[in-house]
Structure formats: structure tokens, C-alpha cells
Regions:
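Non-catalytic accessory regions flanking glycosidase/transglycosidase catalytic cores in CAZymes
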Residues: 20-258, 292-517
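Active-site His/acidic residue clusters
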Residues: 264-286, 332
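Active-site pocket-shaping loop/turn-to-helix segments
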Residues: 285-293
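Histidine-centered catalytic micro-motifs
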Residues: 261
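Bacterial N-terminal signal peptides
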Residues: 6-16
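Positively charged n-region of N-terminal signal peptides that target proteins for export
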Residues: 1-5
Length: 517
């Protein structure tokens, strides 16, 4: 009888283990505070503002005569919210728009500026009220640096060279005199300058070899004072295409400081059926996360090629367009790319940050698309009202990682599986912050189950732990103008430190950022 009971107990236990989801199993790992890695450049948390839909006008710019409270035409609420994020850099004016933008259309008295046509995004008139001076005034207001994207597609080396002289020269020339007449006698400091955008597509449909010659031609004439030269960024590849990295890094020459890279996360398998921003099920939840995790593969593939020609990692790999892209909302202009922003987008943002951190030795700037009212936005506006998205809150939670030092992590994580899709259930990164604390970012991709986690801390002693959590009940939980605080961070008290070990149960579909002191 005793043997029968033991046998039955074993069968029941085996059946229980077999039926358990992967996330019923604990995760264990190590934070290597004893092996500090690369600096996580604050520019990994950059923004992108294109003349597209309501991204600039109504989003950032309302004009000085607007009833919406503003300073010099910039929305007070948006400026204040962006300052809270410690935005390091903003990319402008595009995007595809950059290769049809002629900078002279956006300087001088606003009433005298020409109205042009935005052929890329909805075929709508472009007032040019927001131009060079307005952009540089704006980034100064929010405490950010400037990343300007030059026009290769419909421009010329002379046009680009004159724009850079207008921006940076301190010599008495006709261009600097014009700048002074337009209200800015002193030159600006431009941190980054790109020679074209998506030259494989909307920027000219070029081959890497053809664009290489174009880049070197333009770079020859982009002359600035030695101490005012921006980082020159070449238009690089996208998705799994590594040919651009191979061609540009092997032959780009001394003027090449970085190459760009673009990758968007879509739930579907092709651009004609990307998937919905809201009202989706768990199948689109996991497919979205599986697709966003490909960012790691793409960075690794490009970095391996760059390492062949640039082992000292002098050339940066800048992901200056990334984020989610869904089908347009019914009833809205498709070319305006307005979409809602949910808890899923917050998880996507956190996953990408953890990926970028691991490649901080090569990835030194990224720019999410886009800042306000476009794609995976930080902020949505409607008339005088403003709402902060779940993605905004993730950027805010990750502020301690800006200019922190990467601490390598090891994690034995279970997998989250649904049908044919399977992804790691947990994502983690850690860093030593400027204040000496250890920041730990954790993401639970499983929308149904919490996961117990234990992380040993090697090479450091911490006595206290505090944190924040972002989660919600629904997969597509979102903030609206009627309910602006439906998804927002809350204090997290579920982590315990004991004997150099950090233990917690990471709630389902959550982002948690901890500070260990």
C-alpha cells in the first residue's frame, strides 16, 4: 500500500510540473557590480520630432497668439513635461520630411515664409512657422541638444553647407549677418548633423555604394569651426540589412562619426496589416514583443560587421528611429500616424532600453518615433488638453540610467509561450548611477503570471531598495483625455535585500525600476 501511495504521489507531482507554465518557475541571476562595463550614454533616451501630422503644430508649437498657454509659441504644458524627462537630444526636421525640407523656407519673419507642400505625410500645406530658430529655441527650453537632419534627397552640398555655416559660424559673413538680423547673433552648438535620411527609401532609393559617394561628397563641404563641429551621421540601414554598415564603416573615412539605423515594431507580419493599437488580444501582445526583441539580433549583426573595420568602436551605431507602428485609426488621416499608446507600448519601450544598455559600447544615441502625437508618442494633445502616455512614464522611470555605467547581468529566465511564439519571460539590465546607487530595470513579458526572481549582487553591498512599478489590468490599458492617469507608476515595495541578494516577485505584464543604495 505504501508503494502505491508513493507511486501515485510521484505521478501527481510529475503531472503538476508538466502542466506548469514556464513562468511558474523562478528566475535566478547575478548583477556583476564587480565588472563595470560601458557608459550608458544619456543620448540613448533621445526624442524625434518631424513635420508630420500634429507632431509639431498643435503638439509642440501653437504660435504666440494662441489661447493655449505658451512661451514664445511653445506649449507650456508640453515643455514642462519634456523637461521632466531630462530629454538629452531631439532629432529634427525628419524623417522623410528632411529630404524635401529647404531650410531657407523656415527663417526670417514668419509672415514672409512660403507655404510649401508636405508630400510625404498627407499632402498637406506646410506653413514653415516652425523653422531653424524655433527648433533651436525649443530644445534650449527643454534642456536638450540639437540633432539636425540635412536634405540630400532634394538638396545640394551647397545648401547643406550654407545651413551649417548659418548655424555654427562665428565669422562675419553674409550668412551670419542674416542670422543676426533674424534674432540670433551668436552661433549655435549643434551636437549631431545627419547627411540624409533613409537613403535606401524615401531619401533617394540609393544603393549603399552610391550613397557612400554622396556622403563623402557632402561631408567634404560641411566645414565648421573646429570646436563647433557636430557629429556627422551617415544614413544607414534598417531591419536585417547589414550591407549599409559594411559599406559605410569600411570606406566612410574620417568624417564618419556614426551610422543611423531604423527598426519599427509591428504586431503583424507585413506593413499592409500592421495590427491595431488597441483592442488586441494576447496573440498580438506576444507577437509585438517577439518582434521588438529582434532589435537585439539586428544590433548584434551590425556591430559584428562594424567591429571588423572599427575595433576601437569610434563609429557609433545610432538607432535614430524606433518604436511601435500600428494601422491608422478609423476616421483619421492615415498620413498623420496618430495612434494610441498602451501598456504594451510601455513594455516595448522598456525592452528596447534594456537591449540598448547591453550594446552601450556601440549604440550611443537613439531617438524614439516620435515625441508628440505621432507613433509611439510621449505626449498626446487635444486642443488645450495634454495626456502623458505609458511610454512617457517608462522614459521617466529610466532616468537614472542616463550616463550610468553598465553592470553586466546573468539571468536564467523561464520562457513565455503562446502557440508558436516563445520569448524570454523576463528582461533585466543594471547600472551604477552617477550617485553611486545601483539601478535595476526588470520587465515581465508574461501578461498572466508573476515570476519570482533572485539576483545575487557581486562586488557591492546594498542596504536599502526602493522602486516604482508600471502595470495595469488590461493589455491595452491606456491614458485618455477623460482618464489621464489610468496607467501611471506606483511605488513598488515588493523587493527585499538580504545577504547581497535581491529577491522579488515580478508582477505580470509589468515594468519595475529599482534603486539599490
Amino acid at each position: 500500500m505504501r508503494l502505491i501511495v508513493i507511486a501515485c504521489t510521484f505521478v501527481i507531482l510529475l503531472a503538476t510540473l508538466t502542466s506548469m507554465s514556464a513562468t511558474d518557475l523562478p528566475s535566478a541571476g547575478v548583477i556583476h557590480a564587480d565588472q563595470p562595463g560601458a557608459k550608458i550614454d544619456r543620448h540613448l533616451y533621445g526624442q524625434f520630432a518631424e513635420h508630420l501630422g500634429r507632431g509639431i503644430e498643435e503638439g509642440v508649437w501653437v504660435g504666440e497668439d494662441s489661447r493655449i498657454p505658451n512661451v514664445r509659441g511653445f506649449r507650456n504644458d508640453v515643455v514642462a513635461a519634456l523637461r521632466e524627462l531630462h530629454v538629452p537630444v531631439v532629432r529634427w526636421p525628419g524623417g522623410c520630411f528632411a529630404d524635401e525640407y529647404h531650410w531657407r523656407d523656415g527663417i526670417g519673419p514668419r509672415g514672409s515664409r512660403p507655404t510649401t507642400l508636405n508630400t510625404n505625410w498627407g499632402g498637406v500645406p506646410e506653413s514653415n512657422a516652425f523653422g531653424t530658430h524655433e527648433f533651436l529655441d525649443f530644445v534650449q527650453l527643454i534642456g536638450a541638444e540639437a540633432y539636425i537632419n540635412g536634405n540630400v534627397g532634394t538638396g545640394s552640398p551647397r545648401e547643406m553647407a550654407e545651413w551649417l555655416q548659418y548655424l555654427t559660424s562665428d565669422k562675419p559673413t553674409a550668412l551670419t549677418a542674416e542670422r543676426a538680423r533674424n534674432g540670433h547673433p551668436e552661433p549655435w552648438k549643434i551636437a549631431y548633423f545627419a547627411v540624409g535620411n533613409e537613403t535606401w527609401g524615401c531619401g533617394g532609393n540609393m544603393s549603399p555604394e552610391h550613397y557612400l559617394d554622396v556622403f563623402r561628397q557632402y561631408a567634404t563641404f560641411l566645414k565648421t569651426p573646429v570646436d563647433a563641429r557636430p557629429q556627422l551621421i551617415a544614413s544607414g540601414g534598417h531591419d536585417e540589412d547589414t550591407s549599409w554598415a559594411d559599406t559605410l564603416v569600411s570606406k566612410g573615412g574620417r568624417d564618419l562619426n556614426a551610422i543611423s539605423f531604423h527598426y519599427y515594431t509591428i504586431p503583424g507580419n507585413h506593413w499592409r496589416n500592421k495590427g491595431s493599437a488597441i483592442g488586441f488580444g494576447e496573440d498580438q501582445w506576444i507577437s509585438t514583443l517577439a518582434h521588438t526583441l529582434k532589435m537585439d539580433d539586428f544590433i548584434r549583426a551590425n556591430a559584428a560587421i562594424m567591429d571588423k573595420y572599427d575595433p576601437q568602436k569610434k563609429v557609433a551605431f545610432d538607432v535614430d528611429e524606433w518604436g511601435t507602428w500600428y494601422d491608422p485609426e478609423t476616421g483619421r488621416e492615415p498620413g498623420f500616424l496618430y495612434q494610441q499608446n498602451t501598456l504594451r507600448d510601455a513594455v516595448v519601450a522598456a525592452l528596447n532600453f534594456n537591449i540598448f544598455h547591453q550594446h552601450a559600447d556601440r549604440v550611443r544615441m537613439t531617438n524614439i518615433a516620435q515625441m508628440v502625437n505621432v507613433l509611439q508618442a510621449m505626449i498626446l494633445t487635444k486642443g488645450p488638453r495634454m495626456v502623458l502616455t505609458p511610454t512617457y512614464h517608462v522614459f521617466h522611470m529610466f532616468r537614472p540610467f542616463q550616463d550610468a555605467t553598465l553592470l553586466p547581468t546573468e539571468l536564467q529566465a523561464p520562457r513565455y509561450t503562446l502557440g508558436s511564439e516563445s520569448v524570454p519571460a523576463i528582461s533585466v539590465s543594471a547600472a551604477r548611477t552617477a550617485t553611486g546607487a545601483i539601478a535595476v530595470a526588470l520587465v515581465n513579458l508574461d501578461p498572466r503570471k508573476a515570476t519570482p526572481i533572485t539576483l545575487s549582487i557581486a562586488g557591492a553591498k546594498a542596504r536599502t531598495v526602493t522602486g516604482e512599478i508600471l502595470t495595469a489590468t488590461a493589455l491595452d490599458a491606456r491614458n485618455t483625455f477623460e482618464s489621464p492617469d489610468a496607467v501611471k507608476p506606483a511605488p513598488f515595495s515588493g523587493a527585499v535585500l538580504k545577504d547581497s541578494k535581491l529577491s522579488l516577485s515580478l508582477p505580470a505584464k509589468s515594468v519595475v525600476v529599482l534603486s539599490l543604495q
